Amino acid sequence: MTRSGRPTRRAGLRTVVAALAAVPLIGTAGASAARQESRSRELLRPVPFPPLEVMTFNLRFASAEKPHSWAVRRPVMRTLLHRAAPHVIGTQEGRPQQLLDIGADLGPHYAWIGTSRGVGADEAVAVFYDTRRLAPAGYEHFWLSDTPRVRGSNTWGGGHPRMVTWVRFRDRLAAGRQFCVLNTHLDNASQYARERSAALIAARISRFDPALPLLLTGDFNTVAHENPVYDRLLAAGLVDTWDTARTRGDAYATYHGYKALTPNGGRIDWILATPGVRVQREWTDTFSENGQYPSDHLPVQASLTLG
């Protein structure tokens, strides 16, 4: 019989030692198999994707009007955007040169998609995106009117033509997962126009592939939870990411008009989403420099995963 284990002084223990030496061999084999099974399960488990940073931001159109001219506001906006580092920005009120300025300030890793709401060089609802993270797979513009394909159309009594720009993105860091972003700016003058606009947006949302996560960003010119416009969009199957966020920053009215901020004020700038989108955190960005805000609105940002 071949001896196993280390030598002992007591021959009577040799059998016991041999028996005990055999037990760990069985136990080790079992543990090894368990570890292998655990590793296999780990490999099969879905890899968590990094959060997507999404912002909605009414830029306040560029003008030379003092004291809040674009020349004064632009460097503050540049700093805010660099600090926030969003992957997607749904903007409102951007004018052509202003959008070019913001694109230059964001740097070479950002691009944008947008078009004038009117027939001339007018405001847009441009969507900026970080090209290191996202690639556009399709996009379209439509106008909030009875003739959505007609540029500048305004048939519901609104103060200005209103529109939606939507983009279908492919997430480079999420195995090419696709999702859609719709961005808009509803009318400030007419509740009727806002309600008709919400109904049209809801109808358009119903045409999208339900398997794709969807985000709706915008300045809706109505306070969340307090207007039929909000109710209509939630009835379309969307949720308010401010309400579903796991954690939230301090709440402020998102329009301030360059005056003192209003804690717990009305939110007219929202990020809505399909229910599968999980929001880790959402906040209103109150950044300013020497009392100067980059816009008369506060941007809202959400850190989320697409589910």
Where are these regions (language model features)?
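Metal-dependent phosphoester/phosphodiester hydrolase catalytic core
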Residues: 135, 171-195, 207
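Soluble non-cytosolic domains of exported or imported proteins
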Residues: 67-72, 93-96, 158, 188-196, ...
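Metal-dependent phosphoester-hydrolase catalytic domains
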Residues: 9, 40-43, 192, 206-214, ...
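N-terminal, active-site-proximal structural segment of metallo-dependent hydrolase catalytic domains
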Residues: 2-19, 26-105, 117-122
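Acidic/histidine-rich helix-loop elements
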Residues: 56-74, 144-158, 187
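Solvent-exposed loop/turn segments at secondary-structure junctions
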Residues: 59-63, 94-98, 117-121, 133-134, ...
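Structured beta-strand-rich core segments of catalytic domains in phosphoester-bond hydrolases
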Residues: 40-46, 88, 92-178, 284
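Active-site beta-strand/loop signature of hydrolases that rely on acidic residues for catalysis
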Residues: 53-59, 77-102, 128, 167, ...
